[in-house]
From Swiss-Prot:
GO biological-process terms attached to the record: base-excision repair; chromosomal 5-methylcytosine DNA demethylation, direct 5-methylcytosine excision pathway
Keyword annotations: DNA-binding, Hydrolase, Iron, Iron-sulfur, Lyase, Metal-binding, Nucleus
Lineage: Eukaryota, Viridiplantae, Streptophyta, Embryophyta, Tracheophyta
Enzyme Commission numbers on file: 3.2.2.-
Binding site for [4Fe-4S] cluster: 1492, 1499, 1502, 1508
Organism of this sequence: Oryza sativa subsp. japonica
Family statement: Belongs to the DNA glycosylase family. DEMETER subfamily.
Gene name for this UniProt entry: ROS1C
Name of this chain's protein: Protein ROS1C
UniProt note: phenotype after gene disruption: Increased number of wrinkled seeds. Hypermethylation of cytosine residues in the DNA sequence of Tos17 retrotransposons.
Amino acid sequence: MAKDENPSYLHLIFLSSRIRVFILDPPLSLPLSHGQCELQVVEEAAMDPSGLNLQGNPAENQESWTSGVSVGRGTPNLGVGTAVAGRSCPSSTLFPGSSLSSTALLNTMHEGSFPQTALVAGSVSSADEQHGAPPVRPSYNLPAGCTQVPISILVFHRRLTGRGSRCRSPQSRSFMPAPALSGVSEADGAYGPIPQSDFLSLRGPSEVFPGDMAMNHSEPATSYGYNSEYAPMHLQPNGLYTEASNTESEREASQLQQSAEAVICDSLSKLESAMEKIQGQNPQESSGLVAEGSADDNIHKYHQKAKRARTQITHSDKIDLPTQAVSACKEKTITQIEMQIADAERTEALKGEDAPAQKLKTRRRKHRPKVIREDRPAKKQMATTSEEKPLNQKPKRKYVRKNRNPSSLEKCAEPFSDHSISRESRTTVRSSIASVRRRLQFEFGEHGVQRDQSSMTNSWYQNQEKPVNAESSLCSVTKSSVQVEHGQELHMENSPEGLFFGINSKLNKILDEYIHLPEAAPKPSEQIPLAASGHVSEELARKQYDVRHTHDPDSTSYNIERSGLITTKGHKKDLDLNYSNTNGFQMYCSASLLPEMDSTKGSMTKVSKMDKNKKRHYGGESSLAGTQSSIIMRTAAEMLAVYQACGIKKKRSARVRRNSFLSVMDLEKNTSQESTRLPRSCMEALYESSYIKFMTKKRSQKARLNSPNSIQPNIDQKNRFSSETVFSGGFNGLKRSEETFQKTLPQIPDDKRINLDIHCKVPVESSPNTSTPPYMDYLQGVTSKFRYFDLNTEQVHKTEMHLSQTMPSLSSLGATNYLPNALVPYVGGAVVPYQTQFHLVKKQRPRAKVDLDFETTRVWNLLMGKAADPVDGTDVDKERWWKQEREVFQGRANSFIARMRLVQGDRRFSPWKGSVVDSVVGVFLTQNVADHLSSSAYMALAASFPTGSHGNCNDGIAGQDNEEIISTSAVGDRGTFEFFYNGSRPDIGLNFEFSMACEKIHMEPKDNTTVNELTKGENYSLHCKESAGSLCDHETEIDHKAKSISDFSAVELTACMKNLHATQFQKEISLSQSVVTSESILQPGLPLSSGMDHARRNFVGSISDTASQQVGSNFDDGKSLTGNDVTANETEYHGIKAAATNNYVVDEPGIPSGSSLYPFFSAIDCHQLDGRNDTHVSSTSPNCSICSASSNFKIGTIEENSSLFMPFDAHLAQRNGNMIVDTNLSSALESTELPVKLLHCGKRSCYEASEFQDHESLYATGGVIPETATKADDSTLKSGFASFNGLPDTAAQASKPKKSRTTSKKNSENFDWDKLRRQACGNYQMKERIFDRRDSVDWEAVRCADVQRISHAIRERGMNNVLAERIQKFLNRLVTDHGSIDLEWLRDVPPDSAKDYLLSIRGLGLKSVECVRLLTLHHLAFPVDTNVGRICVRLGWVPIQPLPESLQLHLLELYPVLETIQKYLWPRLCKLDQQTLYELHYQMITFGKVFCTKSKPNCNACPMRSECRHFASAFASARLALPSPQDKRLVNLSNQFAFHNGTMPTPNSTPLPQLEGSIHARDVHANNTNPIIEEPASPREEECRELLENDIEDFDEDTDEIPIIKLNMEAFSQNLENCIKESNKDFQSDDITKALVAISNEAASIPVPKLKNVHRLRTEHYVYELPDSHPLMQQLALDQREPDDPSPYLLAIWTPDELKDTREAPKPCCNPQTEGGLCSNEMCHNCVSERENQYRYVRGTVLVPCRTAMRGSFPLNGTYFQVNEVFADHSSSHNPINIPREQLWNLHRRMVYFGTSVPTIFKGLTTEEIQHCFWRGFVCVRGFNMETRAPRPLCPHFHLAASKLRRSSKKAATEQTH
């Protein structure tokens, strides 16, 4: 018998004589292990080929058959043919229940006489009793060699009994029975309708659809089931069934056995004689040819099968059968009969021309294709034995078409019926017609996957392409069914011959991407292992099914695998794909190719025949060779897979993702060159063609047709098929689009034109288990846009296709809610049936989400400038609600700051030095890393590129770094001469003299309304004189005229203005790539004159630190210097821009430089830059560092500004020390000339006016500026510039309407960002870069340095290569866009504009930008980093959506996205002032490092635990035993809790301290039976001595200054109650009330594990505090401490037993008592300790405060550091200095905590210890080299990290603990 998972029928055919077989009626009951066997014998006499005409109408066959009459329910009707009408007895039927004779017949079968494997040619025809239709004679062809032999058909019909399936013998090679029919029950016994084909159809019961019978309505569905419950029936001669008596059955039992033996023996003898005759005619084909049974094999490919040994079929049940029938047929074997039948089939196929009814092509070339590989000899196919064959193979189907005209392209044959082919028996019933096509199968069972994987892989590589005839028909109607496991079926109907598509793999790739490939040559064959090709895994094995269809001798087989390969030929031949499903939809795809090359023939170039020497290589993907034109629909990733499979290494940098796009490409026509390109990378191979253009796509963007020669219909890979996209239902109505697109653009050549036509058909039937939206309607609308595809020109419109846009995305659904039979996308774009749920990630941790309401989102959009409505709107209720919300958050912020001040100290705003560029680079370094690493990286970068790193001019030789470029440009009528210097940055205190001598320049107006032009000034010469006396001459040629000027005595500048209109002049001073612009406004009536007899104007200026500085001043009638409030009107002008002085009166002889006032002229600090103007002339004076004009300045020392936020507008007279600058609004002044001398005087400088000469006067005419002495302008306030430092007013900023222009629009590449700089420079008084805003790094050197050098400097931070490249690109952008590395103008632009500009910088996100704005630009902003976001969630400031029931808040690992937290917080914090926002942010950062860490937070010491929801959740879980999540990582702890490790602790694992006031206290007992023994601790001498020292040294310390923090128990109880209610919905209010008790501060804690090896976390050292006046400060030459630095210098003393260069405990090496003194060995512990105790000096290390070490300049206002952080001097750490003991007697002693980072130092400390550390102690995490100012690791003497412990030290520590 046979074994299968779902066997139902077993068919055998016997060739017999014409003798009638009388089978008696007594039923046979054959006991089997898993079911019963029903035997049916049908005699078929005088059978000739005409009676079995396949191509004839089945209705014609019915005429020659006698209708059977149905008697009884479920009884099969066996029709009797007319050929046997004259006989006396029709065929008899053996029903179940027969005893002896049936047993004898079966015994004969079991002895091996029956050819059970391949003798299948037909089936029993029966009629359904319910329909009452006459039985239909099965339509099949018999082998040609057996036409003269009468055939009787013996059918074994097995009926399942529900007890499983029978076991097949290992030696059996029987065919695979068809699956059991669905819906069959034992009660009624009526089997469902069978498929239309025959008994051996490959279809299972799930494939029976009404559409199958609709193909041929003349063939009614027949059923051949029988129920054994009914009495056995006997077919009488008149065709009626009657009941047979039991006695009659017993009498005829013996006759049955004899008749069966006679039938078998006679049939075999007749068959042998017929086969011998056939063998004589065709000796070369005597051996059987068996078709491959693999799902990927072509049924036309055969292999010689060696004759097998005799196989005996035995049953699992050892049934003793008679052996009489065995001896009669022992000589015959199953193999011989199988081979004979196969030869008979082939003989019949060769004699096809003899059949008069089949007028088809008579010629058929017998070709046995082979794949010859060059790398190895051809593999000989071995005979496949039954042991190698999997168990659940299904037979193939035979497709035979009617006779047709091969040359006709319009005439198509009628649909033919499917005929079965036994795959297991390796036989094929073939006819002389063109093609036989097998079916695709989905076999996803265990055996289906294991089924002949090697055969699948081998056949994949061994397929050889056959030539294609261009004239072959493309319209023969075929049909292919795709079987899905659970009954789903996909049909591909009305598909042309030359186009087959694997629905299993690429149904969704029809419209994916179109790549035009002409003539691609085959790659050399290469054996690929299974692991490399990807055919081993189950998933990949599912996708390797393909369809191969064979045409006429000149035809080829097309392989449509996962890549969706479609090859078309012919002239304007539409190729239609019809994917249909009875319960699904039908989709037609028509692709037409117009003539490509051979236009004279009216068709495309024919596909040449494959050369025998050119072999096809399949590397896991389908490939096409030998075609001039083809359409290959595949993705770029799939093309790369071809190259990868060929053994080509793929570069990591050349990775192409699945979402990338591959343009339409033309490969070279010469196919012989393809083989020479194998050792290339995949990207090199793709880039090889000049027509290939790769376009990368961001995830958030869509495809753009932005390149010629490209067609990119994009299908979103993620949304192509959702989880609910089922191809078998959910659609109603029948629609089909007949629209075709035959128009093409005029510019499209004929050889590059594609017309795509897509028709969609939706059947009426709908599936009840799906509810998918109308899919095809949307597809029709999208495909209608697929009109014109131009392969050579760029399309104006974009074509985007999303097959399932209306359906939920696969990723969005989280791989849930999959239907059982859903087709889902898989790797490579294949579509596979869904069996189990997809797991996109192994374990996806839940992430909390912020519960954002609509109002919050609306206000956020308003604040971000995404809407034009006012912030609060017009609704009074909303405004009142927002006011309450902001009051609540203001109270929370104030409470948090006040609480943190008690613990972490005062962290109010204290400005640090530094520029905006420093902060921008600082936020680059602080991203996604700890602050101590990012700060060290910036310190290392500053040490590698210190300021003033450029060399000076040596011996008159100018290098690249000190080259001065003076550029001249002319734009239209406007000429601009720009001069600059490039030299070293002189230190403060150096004096320079700089003079500019020009020809006499006259400024005369051309008319009364236009601007003035400088009519002369062709030549000028610049001279710079250093105080040392060196002179560098600079001569510049203008207008190509060189003239040396020796008269440097005077400069005349005359301006005559007679109009009342504002005139603007600008003088641009540029150096190399830098342009420094100063725009000045000349008001009418302002003559500026200077006599020739005046002395030369010299000045000495102070130096700014950036590469460019705005130089200039504003001129207004009667307007004084008003800083930021001055507004200027930009007017178009022609001529040279010149700088002029402002009209102001200086009451006191000086202008404070530390104030917000812009100086008259700024000192220019320049570096070598590239000139952006047309002409530039180089000069060689690096020392020229001061630019001069016709004025003299003096710099004097001033007192520092006492008030930080001194508003400029509120007080026009600003006091800075003893210097006051007032404004004079006089309108009577007529002329002005102000010589000012600029001098350097120490670190602080100011501008001081020199004496006025007699002929110099100051005039001002007309006052144009309103009085601003008392208040600022409202518009200025609303613009956010009410204060001098650009800090916006809070109320005005909040109420200001936001711009409607979005950020994305401003961030476009076309936006001119330099316009913001020009506006800031033109609208406001020009501002000098003050000393506090200088750069801390030589950014010009960083920009010009090698990226590797930058990367090496920041290597310890991580991501150094990426960040180094970003930093350098950022600096290059500044030079390119703005001409200099300067962003100080961002302080003067509106906050929104500054924000948009910063967001446009690559690498800066919202958090980084907000950090720069708040901490550096001092704008109103609140950045939300990881610390802030985590704290806000835990404190309950930000509401989150409900978490899963199994997840408590304290177990949450993934917090919400930071942007969503900021979206909720900022609308509620936007009303706070800048100082509050700064301190709130700084305190939260420190709080997140010290207390509220990400993992293992120090909740018991947290001062905010009463309001914390995280602590309430953890407390409730530990104390009240809330339900814990079902986690596999749960461990049973004996004496500690592990809730902080992400697991819920065991409630009763540790005895808890008693809660005060608990009503259940008497019921709580600790499970500790050990006796309690209390004994006092022995006092130690060390502690007593230490206490004494503390009393002596710290006598003046007041410990009461440290405040005591008390826990708010009421708030804690309320918070705990809310947490319990949220976590446990089942708790009643009474239970919660009982659970909540009065908890004290001591009891309000959660159990935490005891920290081990605390010394590895931190090391505590006592140090001495050095005052500023200590003599040691001068002896060590330490830098002056910064005034704002709260920390002093410290001195750490080494104890006598601490040796400087050892980490191990010291050991004595001598005995002082015996030797009588101290030895001189420095390593002797005893002697050294004694000597140091007696010595008057001690060894020590200096600790430098962080702010002083950085000289007060650091990015982001120094928030990287703690306020009490110090650095250990690297030099004195390794070589301690000697300090006299008497200098330390009166010093205060403090505690310093050394460690690797702040979080590790404070881990496990109590609140009081943390308080003491911040109030009285210090922290130190790094060393510091005071010479190079670079960070260094801590000396092991102070702290040795656990990661740096030696193995020996660890062992020693372990021994000491034991």
